[in-house]
A protein has these predicted regions:
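Terminal, non-catalytic protein-protein interaction segments that mediate quaternary/complex assembly
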Residues: 1-216
């Protein structure tokens, strides 16, 4: 599901330049249905791909262009937070800043979140960040830059576990039994070509946890 949600965000979350409203598509219906049945407002993918009042600013494409032109740039940042539009969103974005740095040939990503549900949100946020790093590294290699995936640093201003998920949280903290080494196989697609599939996990057999999203 993380791949499909990332694709949903990278593709504009079902919005268009002239209709800047994120919509729940079949790819993310299970994840986003607690908040809405259809429209979510100008959130995530709208800010990423159809920014500004007229919807013409493509932040993802802008960042890709900056990194392709100069991988050492310190200006490769996109955001999902626009204060004047937060009131029109069904839920304000939790991760709000994605800042890129290429240092020593390694593609690094810093994600800053205003709020993080450690049980229901953090696993997706960090996995999607890891996938973004691989996608960006693929893009830069396609343009002749000798880079490899680097580090993901995730920072949150408010990490929390809701009371109804404390039991799940305690079980998640228990050491997992690993019978075989887990191998993650990244896709060869780039950021702008990603179609929501291609990443694979081999020998991954984690327990299934049932946690409830808290709508606040």
């Amino acid at each position: 599901m993380a791949q499909r949600e990332l694709y949903w965000m990278l593709s504009g979350s079902g919005a268009t330049q002239h209709d800047r409203c994120a919509r729940i598509t079949p790819d993310v219906e299970r994840m986003w249905s607690p908040w809405a049945t259809d429209e979510l407002g100008p959130m995530y993918g709208v800010q990423w791909r159809y920014g500004g009042p007229d919807g013409t600013y493509d932040a993802v494409r802008d960042v890709v262009g900056r990194l392709v032109a100069n991988p050492t740039t310190k200006r490769a940042v996109w955001t999902a937070w626009q204060g004047y539009e937060v009131g029109s969103m069904r839920i304000p974005p939790c991760p709000v800043i994605w800042a890129w740095n290429v240092i020593g040939g390694r593609v690094n990503l810093d994600i800053f979140a205003r709020s993080t549900d450690v049980v229901c949100g953090l696993p997706y946020d960090t996995l999607e960040g890891w996938m973004l790093i691989h996608l960006m590294a693929n893009t830069l290699r396609t343009h002749g830059h000798a880079v490899t995936p680097g580090q993901l640093r995730f920072t949150t201003a408010n990490a929390h576990v809701y009371c109804q998920n404390l039991d799940v949280w305690h079980r998640m903290l228990m050491p997992a039994r690993v019978e075989k080494e887990i191998e993650f196989i990244p896709t060869k697609q780039g950021v702008l070509e990603f179609k929501g599939k291609g990443f694979k996990a081999v020998n991954y057999k984690a327990p299934i946890y049932s946690a409830k999203v808290v709508v606040v």
